[in-house]
UniProtKB/Swiss-Prot annotation:
It is found in: Cytoplasm. A motif ('HIGH' region) lies at residues 11-21. A motif ('KMSKS' region) lies at residues 333-337. GO terms for cellular component: aminoacyl-tRNA synthetase multienzyme complex; cytosol. This is Methionine--tRNA ligase. Its cofactor is Zn(2+). The keyword Metal-binding applies. It comes from Pyrobaculum aerophilum (strain ATCC 51768 / DSM 7523 / JCM 9630 / CIP 104966 / NBRC 100827 / IM2).
Length: 570
């Protein structure tokens, strides 16, 4: 079995993630990590809250609170919400942990010693009113590439391009809105030019990168990589370890991406196996997979590999960065200021976690932007989750419970139809496996659902309710194979809807662990079923209207409160 490090993009903690953030990184990573565990692989799945840098510091200044207090309160809330979403992190940490701070400082000192860091004096924006330098999100303006009006000093969130504050058109202070002045300051730079050829080779020869990640990265490389400042003048962050860099901090993106390593270090430290992190990150056979939205591609496909190469510590290069396109909400971008979208705390007040997980994976934006709409969600829940999956499971188990003594019937002598059905189920299961392996999670789930659809057609064609009256052996064979197909269905859907899959497993009376191989094992004849009940229920249009009214009421309560940690519903 293989070793995997799975990482999902580290969310900023100035607010909780929305549905688009979830499917773009955390939920997708969880589905893949769960699949790998079902296959028996050794998996360490990590992430954490990105608590440093300008996003938190700007918000804290505006609210008049300490950035550390702000970020730790929000981190605890986000961590709890991920648990409620059944995200199976081995460790969810934060970038202010002692382990991360020490790791980052030691890592950058090594890069400095290797000669990849140089100093340069540069003009940087400064707000004379607030008497602060304006790195990254402290300064906003118009993007020179796409014209987006609120591009940040380090990156445009609209087009994803990395920026320098000097490139912004009509820049202003994000705190007070004043026009900045420019002052000379010294910063420490990573010399990306010296790493460019090796990064190009990594990108061009990587067969695992999705098209959007490869195309975006090659476009950046075609323009040529420029040195990037790894230090900032803001106070809230990891102190820069370089000689003479007192008062400087490490740029948040250049330290947060190292969290995928430091979190693995911290995880093994917590379980008393301190040196075992090396068995993952220092082994060239380890597969390292990141899950991010496409706006995070540059830092994962260009910057992090560059840092690993510059450090020279023998770290394994990332296998791939599974980057999604954007999820829209009712045809438009998510926007907290416009109250447009659903955030993960609100979602759980409306529907169970597995409903959300299934819908989001079912429409995952793998190759193009996709749209979440309540009408689409209603159709997926009612027709796919309830009618196809839930109804099939209930038909099979209720019939065995009520007409066959509540235990798995003998296989008997299956007909050609019975054998063809289970072979078709096995082929679908293998096809779903191939999709999971390729991180085509949407296609994987769509394929597993086909098992339920084929099962419903099989029951309708074989009509065991008639067979049982005239040929008990034939009826037994039908229901034996239908029961077996539920094993494939439960295991195939377990990465996406783990709670429901476990419920189905228990209803089937199965004691064996739910694993990929267990699905393939023929059922034990005579195995008593557990309590049989419907897995899902339909949602009416009237209920959706009531849910949206509840959502608006929740928001009126949330946004009447001052502090972000008071605006979260748990």
């Amino acid at each position: 079995m293989a070793k995997y490090v799975i990482g999902s993009a580290w969310p900023y903690v100035q607010t909780v993630p929305h549905l688009g953030n979830m499917i773009g990184s955390v939920l997708s990573a969880d589905v893949y990590a769960r699949y790998l565990r079902l296959k028996g692989h050794e998996v360490v799945f990590v992430s954490g809250s990105d608590v440093h840098g300008t996003p938190v510091e700007v918000e804290a200044i505006q609210l008049g609170v300490d950035p550390a207090e702000y970020s730790m309160k929000m981190h605890a809330i986000v961590a709890e919400l991920f648990k409620k979403w059944n995200i199976s992190f081995d460790l969810y940490t934060h970038t202010h942990s002692e382990t991360h701070i020490k790791f980052v400082q030691d890592f950058y000192l090594k890069i400095y010693e290797n000669g990849y860091i140089f100093t340069k004096e540069d003009e940087v924006p400064y707000c004379p009113r607030d008497k602060i330098y304006l790195p990254d999100r402290f300064i906003i303006g118009k993007c020179p590439y796409c014209g987006y009006e609120r591009a940040r000093g380090d990156q445009c969130e609209n087009c994803g391009r990395l920026l320098d504050p000097k490139q912004l058109i009509e820049p202003k202070c994000a705190v007070c809105g004043s026009k900045p002045e420019w002052r000379i300051t010294k910063h420490w730079y990573l010399d990306l030019r010296r790493l460019e050829d090796r990064i190009r080779k990594y990108v061009e020869e990587n067969p695992h990168l999705p098209p959007n990640a490869k195309e975006m990265s090659l476009a950046m490389l075609k323009e040529g990589l420029r040195p990037r400042a790894v230090t900032r003048d803001n106070k809230w962050g990891i102190p820069a370890p370089f000689p003479g860099a007192e008062g400087k901090t490490i740029y948040v993106w250049f330290e947060a991406v190292l969290g995928y390593i430091s979190a693995v270090v911290e995880y093994f430290k917590k379980i008393g196996r301190e040196e075992e992190w090396k068995r993952f990150w220092l082994d060239p056979e380890t597969k390292v997979v990141f899950f991010v939205g496409k706006d995070n591609v540059p830092f994962h496909v260009i910057i992090l590999p560059a840092l690993l190469l510059a450090n020279g510590g023998g770290y394994v290069m990332p296998t791939t960065t599974a980057s999604t396109e954007y999820l829209l909400y009712e045809g438009d971008k998510f926007s907290k200021s416009r109250r447009w979208g659903v955030w993960i705390d609100e979602a759980l007040q409306l529907l169970p976690a597995d409903y959300w997980r299934f819908v989001l994976i079912y429409i995952r934006p793998e190759n193009r932007d996709t749209n979440f709409s309540w009408s689409t969600a209603l159709e997926i829940i009612n027709k796919v989750l309830n009618d196809d999956v839930g109804n099939y499971a209930n038909r099979v188990l209720s019939f065995i419970k009520n007409r066959m003594g509540g235990a798995v019937p003998p296989r008997g002598k299956p007909s050609r139809d019975d054998e063809e059905f289970i072979e078709k189920v096995k082929r679908l299961f293998e096809k779903a496996e191939a999709h999971y392996e390729a991180i085509e999670l949407k296609d994987a789930v769509h394929t597993v659902v086909e098992i339920a659809r084929e099962g419903n057609k099989y029951l309708n064609a074989r009509a065991p309710w008639d067979l049982v009256k005239k040929d008990v052996d034939a009826a037994n064979a039908v229901m034996y194979h239908a029961y077996w197909s539920l094993k494939f269905l439960a295991v195939g859907l377990a990465p996406a809807i783990p709670e429901s899959a476990e419920q189905l497993w228990k209803m089937m009376g199965l004691d064996a662990p739910l694993t990929w191989e267990e699905a393939k094992r023929p059922p034990a004849v005579g195995k008593a079923l557990g309590e049989v009940r419907p897995l899902f229920r339909k949602i009416t249009e009237e209920e959706v209207k009531a849910l949206l009214a509840k959502l608006e009421e929740l928001r009126n309560q949330k946004y009447s409160r001052k502090y972000p940690w008071e605006q979260v519903v748990i």
